[in-house]
């Protein structure tokens, strides 16, 4: 099956191309921290030769508690993103939660993300599709891999075929997520070769049934990322923080920022190896 290529500026995202890193921080905590984290990612990815897109949320609209930090909001968030682009020349990905956010966000960033909990909301899909932007679709935790084809088709019917699909784990009983490694191939087939990326960070979440925030298993970041890359995918989605225990959202799943370079060096070596193999077509 031919693998589709989605272009983000000069970056080619495809399952048979060198992996692209979609990474940054969970939520914009401050302008200064965003600048610090983005600068570190840019330095490391430039050194290793890894195509890179910076990720952060300007509004975490789906926090478990109404008291949890959500972010700086649309206006301030777009100002920070624009400064990051102007300073580092970096591409940006962020999520939208309402139809009204789609165009203002697409005017600034390079990829707009459809959140997992909202992936079947047709009005939101239509609004995002109309922007003409590259779209990253988070596969819902409650959806089987084969069903992503319906979301891709919905975007296509709305006039946008620049779709990336993102695996972020599936519900396994209550308060736990697992990643079915067979699902990557199913998603490729169901979407007719769309690029698949792997959100390692959020796949490591584990909820406290009585708590207002997610726990996590960041100590297993490396093994999970290696397993995903070994299936031959287009990219990784990672969140890092200089002090994960002090992060304002999803710290327990975040990669310590000082581990980024050794982590990515291993991921690049593995990805290069996997994609050097001749494809074996088994029917």
Swiss-Prot record:
It catalyses: D-arabinose 5-phosphate + phosphoenolpyruvate + H2O = 3-deoxy-alpha-D-manno-2-octulosonate-8-phosphate + phosphate. GO terms for molecular function: 3-deoxy-8-phosphooctulonate synthase activity. It is found in: Cytoplasm. This is 2-dehydro-3-deoxyphosphooctonate aldolase. SUPFAM superfamilies: Aldolase. HAMAP family: KDO8P_synth (MF_00056). One of its GO terms (cellular component) is cytoplasm. Gene3D superfamilies: Aldolase class I. Disulfide bonds: none annotated. It comes from Vibrio parahaemolyticus serotype O3:K6 (strain RIMD 2210633). Its EC number is 2.5.1.55. Keywords: Cytoplasm, Lipopolysaccharide biosynthesis, Transferase. Pfam families: DAHP_synth_1 (PF00793). One of its GO terms (biological process) is keto-3-deoxy-D-manno-octulosonic acid biosynthetic process. Belongs to the KdsA family. PANTHER family: PHOSPHO-2-DEHYDRO-3-DEOXYHEPTONATE ALDOLASE. Pathway: Carbohydrate biosynthesis; 3-deoxy-D-manno-octulosonate biosynthesis; 3-deoxy-D-manno-octulosonate from D-ribulose 5-phosphate: step 2/3; Bacterial outer membrane biogenesis; lipopolysaccharide biosynthesis. It comes from the Bacteria.
